[in-house]
Amino acid sequence: DFGGLPAWLLKDRNMRLRCAYPEYLQHVSDFYHRLFEEIGDLQQSEGGNIIAMQIENEYGSYGNDKEYLRYIEKLMLDCGTKVMLFTSDGDDNSMLSGGTLPDVFKTLNFGSRASEIFNAMDRFHENTPKMCTEFWCGWFDHWGEEHHTRGSDSVAGEIKDFLDIDASFNFYMFHGGTNFGFTAGANCYEEYQPTVTSYDYCALLTEWGDYTPAYYAVRELLLKAQNLPETELPASPELQTIGKVELDESTSLMSNFDNLGERHYVPLPESMEYFGQNSGMIYYETKLEQIYDPRELRVANVHDTAYVY
């Protein structure tokens, strides 16, 4: 949700995200300096397993501020990056133009048509090694939509295309996951598309770590491509039945607001970000002490969902 950025950034009513806005850059700098205290020694150059680091993420889908991208690049180097830097974007010219830097390795994100898409990259920047940083095994599931599925033959067929043109790829996702609480986020194009709690994504391993038909198909293909013998796989994870849970007590939500949150008095409704709240809900209450004629209640600028009592 919100790209992992903290909600309190928007308490600055002039805040501009993912660009060369000084206050935003200062917060990014603070974060990176603290981050590298944790990951600096984990780089391949130091004997670790971090082989490369990415500048931003699909920035060409959002903006084209080259000063900002150069700032992030320099910040990462100043913080101690010793491995290769790269960018990762969609395949059309506007995305590649906005999200890349001339002297930084460029990678692509897509889920099919590898040969065609890498040809588009060649037109944009010749002789670039072919790398798909996000090979999409599936897609997001949104509330109210059908569950996205993708056949194992389709996934394996795309991987074969990568192998046929000597391209590299990274699975997105290899292991299904879970968006806990309110962290799922959403897409928002012509309409708002909230993502469900599950991040299954038709990954090769399920959300609970079990094998899928696509896993076996891709495994067979890769073993054959590398002339490797088939070895025994770890056992599938054991599942358990939780059983019946008896609930014999309850309480009113509205009678417990003071136990669940902090009360604030403000002249006008403020957003969650104003209070530094990343997710969840806010209960707004007001008293109409004057006499009003009956009229339609209008609530503007609701972002996500509002319940009116």
Where do the PLM segments sit?
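Substrate-binding/catalytic cleft of secreted carbohydrate-active enzymes
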Residues: F2-F171
